[in-house]
A protein has these predicted regions:
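Conserved G/P- and acidic residue-centered "switch" motifs that form tight phosphate/ATP-binding loops
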Residues: 106
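Acetyl-CoA-dependent GNAT
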Residues: 6-12, 16, 20-101, 109-114, ...
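C-terminal "cap" of GNAT-fold acetyltransferases
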Residues: 90-91, 125-140, 144-172
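Extreme N-terminal starter segment of soluble prokaryotic enzymes
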Residues: 1-3
């Protein structure tokens, strides 16, 4: 059985492991291997500890916890970044990662449904997120969850390779 709860500081190592392994699994063939190979759980955990303890943080972190296994998924959401041209009332899912061996088992869906529930309770009326172009599994997942591409794109550079992200939105 898997349940969703707020992330706490004791979850940082597990969340970093999920995030790093999630990146390495989801983005193989999309993001340069040199970038993926350089990612470490230790470095990610150090950044996450610093970020998690930041005063005034407006983002929310959720973990999916499997009985007998601990955290197996992580989602972070909140208001759009400062200066983002989003309509009033929009929230953003910043990240969603599931342990690679549990992709397709409903863990991601549980996290996303809980995030949508909480976003509505916090007054958001829509949710946006960014998906790496070519990440077909993620695109299908979000489309099945009611998200649609809204035409906005942004570029990110990984080891001198420019990759495009697509923005997806849905009403809450």
């Amino acid at each position: 059985m898997t349940h969703v709860r707020d992330m706490d500081e004791a979850d940082i190592e597990a969340v970093s492991r999920i995030r790093v392994r999630g990146w390495q699994a989801a983005y193989a063939g999309l993001v340069p291997g040199t970038h993926l190979d350089a990612m470490t759980v230790e470095d990610d955990a150090a950044r996450r500890r610093q970020w998690f303890s930041r005063p005034g943080r407006t983002s929310r972190d959720l973990v999916a916890v499997a009985d007998g296994r601990g955290p197996v998924g992580w989602l972070c959401y909140g208001p759009p970044p400062a200066g983002a041209p989003d309509p009033a009332g929009s929230g953003e899912v910043y990240a969603l990662y599931v342990a690679p061996d549990l992709i397709g088992t409903g863990v991601g869906r549980r996290l996303l449904e809980e995030a949508h529930h909480r976003m509505r309770a916090e007054g958001f009326t829509a949710s946006a997120l960014w998906v790496l172009a070519g990440n077909e599994r993620a695109l299908r997942f979000y489309e099945r969850s009611g998200y649609e591409a809204d035409g906005r794109t942004q570029d990110d550079v990984y080891d001198e390779v420019t990759l495009t992200e697509l923005r997806y939105r849905r009403p809450l």
